[in-house]
Amino acid sequence: MRVGERAVNRVSGMRRNSPRGSVTLADVAALAGVSTSTASLAYRSTGSITPATRARILRAAAELGYAGPDPMARSLKSGRSGIVGVVVAGSIRRAFQNPVALATMAGLSEALDELDVGQLLLPGRREPHAGAAPLLEGMPVDAVVFLTRGEEVDALLPGLRARRIPIVGVEGPHGDGVAVVDIDDARGMGELARHVRGLGHRRVGVLMRTTRIEEDGPPGPVVPVGQGLEEIVNRTIRERLRAARSVFPDAVRVEAGGRDLEAGEAAAGVLLDLPSPPTAILAQNDMLAASALQAAAARGIRVPEDLTVTGFDGADLPWLGRRLTTVEQPLHDRGVHAGRMVGELLAGRTAASVVLPVRLRTGETAAAPA
């Protein structure tokens, strides 16, 4: 009997004697005429193995119907799953509709690709949809990146720390053991507000991001811009409001009832329908600014001739049809920084938090009041 025939017969015997007749990596190695450790190298992206040997091992695997090493067994052996959890604001569906989230995830993916790890997107919302909490509790992730912040995120941190899972936050959450990629919200909004004041505006309304856990609801009431400021948990919202108040202490604000354009338009409408409407609206992000433009157009209000509208983020909004006056933050780069922080933490090193710069971008939506 030839050597190849003996190998095939030996493998057939292994298949009959193994549980449920399953094929193992040792079976593949025997058929390919290599050691089990050499056969395992064919399924890794790194390792010293010649192309010819890899091809022979994969041919043997195909002949035996072997799909590859059990990822759970590999995870148990290495202590790594090769998965990084990424928690987004609200639902995953809405994250894919958000240009800020998309640009950040693109940068994050670019950096994580270099680490040869996969990503698991998790929703940050709470009831009636449970969100990330029950998923993360038993999920074998190597690290978690938060693209959101708030009470629901803070509640997850103790469990992750107890499991010694590295945590990275983009604009939060802030706390012990969290590496944060931040931007200078206060400086950016302050510079933007001073620009608007320099144009001559004094009657100003602030269109505020929602602080609600639930997805949808009516706009909030018109209140002074600084009312209840310290009670706002979201640091980004709070810092941008504080900066606007420092320049326009008499400004008013309205909170959007949700994250979509319709919710922002409804909130902007509340400001525009006031007996003495503002001559300028400072929106806390570019999507809210787009909503304000829609609300103005629906009322025949010209921008910037009759109304100044500004945003924050510098998001890619080609469908807007005009260049928005806004504050640009490095959306792609903050994702890259977050991914590199993950790499540092997985390597057992310390990842220092960073504050990235922002800049004022003048566009076509701001002018002196009529």
Where are these regions (language model features)?
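N-terminal helix-turn-helix DNA-binding module of bacterial transcription factors
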Residues: 1-80, 370
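Alpha-helical recognition/docking segments in bacterial nutrient-uptake
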Residues: 1-23, 83-86, 91-198, 370
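Flexible loop/turn connectors
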Residues: 2, 269-270, 274-370
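Short acidic/polar active-site loop segments enriched in Thr and Asp
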Residues: 35, 82, 142, 201-203, ...
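Glycine-rich phosphate-binding loop signature in dinucleotide/nucleotide-binding domains
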Residues: 64, 139, 199-201, 271-277
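Hinge/beta->alpha junction and helix N-cap segments in small-molecule ligand-binding domains
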Residues: 90-103, 122-129, 150, 181-191, ...
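Short acidic capping loops at alpha-helix termini that bridge into adjacent secondary structure
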Residues: 202-203, 251, 303-308
